Amino acid sequence: MAVVAVFQGASFARDDYEEAVRRLTGGKSRMESPSDWPVEGLLVHVAGEGAQGFRVLDVWESEEAFNRFGETLLPILQEIGVDVSPDLYPAYAFVSA
């Protein structure tokens, strides 16, 4: 079952996101393709800034796929000083073009 992961918090800003992307991709400034992720299973990735701060929303094909990604991502977030845990929940519906 697909899962949704939302990252948002007071200690998470656009600069932090950009640094995490650089570390995940070996120096790229943007995530542009599912092949940029270190594990398979990503269905959708959206990042942007709103009234309540910077937010990242991912949809993964399964919780197991997200957990594999977390094994790489969470140490990076700790290294750059981001203390945010994702809000993770099952996708009730998923539609893509």
Tell what function each PLM region has:
Residues 75:
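Short, aromatic/basic amphipathic alpha-helical patches
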Residues 1-57, 61-72, 82-97:
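Short S/T/G/P-rich N-terminal loop/turn motif that feeds into the first structured element of a domain
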